[in-house]
């Protein structure tokens, strides 16, 4: 590898909007993110399942379809 052409690799403190902090390696010293594994619905178990069958029935009833 040639010297002085690669970016500096430093510890990066990542801050989430929910207040969670963790450290990773990156080219930037700080990152701010909107969502992380502590507040994402998939990881927290509060994931909502949308019931589309009710919407389909309502649409069919509205337009008198079978």
UniProtKB/Swiss-Prot annotation:
Cofactor note: Binds 1 zinc ion per subunit.
A Pfam family this chain is assigned to: Ribosomal_L31
Keywords, sorted A to Z: Metal-binding, Ribonucleoprotein, Ribosomal protein, RNA-binding, rRNA-binding, Zinc
Molecular function per GO: metal ion binding; rRNA binding; structural constituent of ribosome
Residues binding Zn(2+): 16, 18, 36, 39
One GO cellular component, as annotated: ribonucleoprotein complex
Signal peptide: none
Role according to the record: Binds the 23S rRNA.
Subunit structure: Part of the 50S ribosomal subunit.
NCBIfam families: L31, PRK00019.1, PRK00528.1
Protein name, as recorded: Large ribosomal subunit protein bL31
Organism, scientific name: Nitratiruptor sp. (strain SB155-2)
The encoding gene: rpmE
């Amino acid at each position: 590898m040639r010297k002085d052409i690669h970016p500096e690799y430093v510890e990066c403190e990542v801050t989430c909007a929910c207040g969670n902090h963790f450290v990773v390696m990156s080219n930037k010293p700080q990152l701010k993110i909107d969502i992380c594994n502590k507040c994402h619905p998939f990881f927290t178990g509060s994931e909502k399942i949308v019931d589309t069958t009710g919407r389909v029935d309502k649409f069919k009833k509205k337009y008198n379809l079978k």
